């Protein structure tokens, strides 16, 4: 008997997650100087993280032989101040918000339970749901209506087997927010857990931030992350805000030391450096407008309005998305080909914000490809 005979059937069906490409990969494959590559494919903060973090990490080096605190009171207090939520309603995870998603699946999903996922959206929801034995009911962000959430497609899929409903707002990769009244309708129509993914909420208008719904509704969990505005994608820190009961259940099965000492120090320092956070957010929104206005000038592209640090673009010049993205790669520009997103035709790519100088170079290269 080979190992193949022992592997779970659901795992054999899986296709590996397709992440954004790295500068190192493109430098190797195309022989381009890494310093000249423009990376606009992974929704990162192009200005990096707080410069104060480097000093704090140097001071932490002498402690790396020690296990981290399973729960860091200082980090919990800083997150509480940032979100204006009680610490007992917060759970922090390593591996970004992905750990929180996985832990929710672990405490709620039995084989044959159902989850509802509107598509196109973040692919990790489906990966985690499937590996934990859930059946997925697909709802939709309606392409013909500017990718607005089709609320009825969610409501019509709710059954007694529904355990979790995923709502990403701003949605990845489309960039649009789900109207608050639509989310309220869904939350109040079911006792299933509604996971509201706010990974990019800082870039949207304040009225769309529903983090405080974790106190208003027992069946809401709001996901947040340090990977975007805070510039800590490489440290993998995320957290959930939800009811005390759900936090208690998650703490029972949460990996004990998933958040490293370095990650904890980085997150605390990032939260304390409000000046850097505010500057990154302000310049991030300005960068988004620079790219959006620049791309709108190309008739061969359809650019979708966005409330995130990226935007979705449809190619209309006869090329598919893979051909278009390959043309950009050859010129040293990394964007995200969206062919792997369930529910999207093969003509879409996603572009993240860059520095103002990177944006100018990118738009010049775009003009060489589409005109």
Swiss-Prot record:
Q: Which cofactor does it need?
A: pyridoxal 5'-phosphate
Record-linked InterPro entries:
Aminotransferase_I/II_large, HisP_aminotrans, PyrdxlP-dep_Trfase, PyrdxlP-dep_Trfase_major, PyrdxlP-dep_Trfase_small
Q: Does the keyword Amino-acid biosynthesis apply?
A: yes
N6-(pyridoxal phosphate)lysine sites (modified residues): 228
Q: Which UniProt keyword terms apply here?
A: Amino-acid biosynthesis, Aminotransferase, Histidine biosynthesis, Pyridoxal phosphate, Transferase
Q: Which GO terms describe its molecular function?
A: histidinol-phosphate transaminase activity; pyridoxal phosphate binding
The record's EC number reads 2.6.1.9
Q: In which pathway does it act?
A: Amino-acid biosynthesis; L-histidine biosynthesis; L-histidine from 5-phospho-alpha-D-ribose 1-diphosphate: step 7/9
- Biological process GO annotation list? L-histidine biosynthetic process
| Catalyzed chemical reaction(s) | L-histidinol phosphate + 2-oxoglutarate = 3-(imidazol-4-yl)-2-oxopropyl phosphate + L-glutamate
Family classification: Belongs to the class-II pyridoxal-phosphate-dependent aminotransferase family. Histidinol-phosphate aminotransferase subfamily.
* Protein name from the UniProt record: Histidinol-phosphate aminotransferase
Q: From what organism does this protein derive?
A: Methanococcus maripaludis (strain C5 / ATCC BAA-1333)
